[in-house]
């Protein structure tokens, strides 16, 4: 079957993308690794020995970066609806994060302890229709924030991919209520035409009793 013009243009952009070439050279599974590395360079989110949850982890670019930074004394729980090839010392939970059963598996993996950081690169399959895509994207963001509120230690941090659009302002307000400091990040490795940004919440205020 002949490729569409859109598909051809995507393939051309993909293979000409310097971050794709860097990922292949550096041994990372996706160009997304450089988004996290750039944020890490600026904000020093990830430190040795930390306990981290990585949502939307497949194919594993963020988990690779995080695993290397937290080292053998750290703990990383990764989850995605898609399969992900194993990474040493990473606990992977495959399933749909919108399902209660998958959330329960993540909480079981966390156990009675708390985590230092929740990161999420989740995004729904995009249809190109903002009226459809934004509610789906914001729903995933809300679920990730709810998980963060349940598992983070006081002072913990939260990093999530988010798209500007309907629901963003309300979500930003919710994060500000939960964290001492909230900032936006747009890594240079994020494609110019993409509306994605990363919202960073620092200093979890703790759960209200």
Swiss-Prot record:
Q: Where is this region: Disordered?
A: 182-209
Q: Does the keyword Membrane apply?
A: no
Main subcellular localisation = cytoplasm
Tell me which family the UniProt entry assigns to this protein. Belongs to the class I-like SAM-binding methyltransferase superfamily. RNA methyltransferase RlmE family.
Protein name, entry field = Ribosomal RNA large subunit methyltransferase E
In terms of HAMAP family, this protein maps to: RNA_methyltr_E (MF_01547)
Which catalytic reaction applies to this protein?
uridine(2552) in 23S rRNA + S-adenosyl-L-methionine = 2'-O-methyluridine(2552) in 23S rRNA + S-adenosyl-L-homocysteine + H(+)
Give the matching Pfam families: FtsJ
Report the locations given in the UniProt record: Cytoplasm
EC number of the protein: 2.1.1.166
Looking up PANTHER family in the UniProt record yields:
RIBOSOMAL RNA METHYLTRANSFERASE, RRNA METHYLTRANSFERASE 2, MITOCHONDRIAL
**EC top class named in words:** transferase
Could you tell me what this protein does? Specifically methylates the uridine in position 2552 of 23S rRNA at the 2'-O position of the ribose in the fully assembled 50S ribosomal subunit.
* Gene behind the chain: rlmE
GO CC annotation: cytoplasm
Q: Which residues bind S-adenosyl-L-methionine?
A: 60, 62, 80, 96, 121
- Give the Basic and acidic residues compositional bias ranges: 182-196
What domain of life does the UniProt record list for this protein's source? Bacteria
Q: Which UniProt keywords apply?
A: Cytoplasm, Methyltransferase, rRNA processing, S-adenosyl-L-methionine, Transferase
């Amino acid at each position: 079957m002949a490729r569409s013009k859109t598909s051809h243009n995507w393939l051309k952009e993909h293979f000409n993308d310097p971050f794709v070439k860097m990922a292949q050279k550096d041994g990372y599974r996706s160009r997304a690794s450089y988004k996290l590395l750039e944020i890490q360079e600026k904000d020093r989110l990830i430190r040795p020995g930390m306990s981290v949850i990585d949502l939307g982890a497949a194919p594993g670019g963020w988990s690779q970066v995080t695993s290397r930074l937290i080292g053998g004394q750290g703990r990383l729980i990764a989850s995605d609806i898609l399969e992900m090839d194993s990474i040493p010392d990473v606990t992977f939970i495959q399933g749909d994060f919108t399902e209660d059963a998958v959330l329960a598996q993540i909480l079981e993996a966390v156990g009675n302890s708390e985590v230092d950081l929740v990161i999420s690169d989740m995004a729904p399959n995009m249809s190109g229709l903002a009226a459809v895509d934004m509610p789906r994207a914001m729903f995933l963001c809300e679920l990730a924030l709810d998980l963060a509120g349940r598992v983070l230690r006081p002072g913990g941090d939260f990093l999530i991919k988010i798209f500007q659009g309907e629901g963003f302002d309300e979500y930003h307000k919710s994060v500000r209520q939960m964290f001492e400091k909230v900032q936006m990040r747009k890594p240079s490795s994020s494609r110019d035409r993409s509306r994605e940004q990363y919202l960073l919440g620092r200093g979890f205020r703790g759960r209200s009793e």
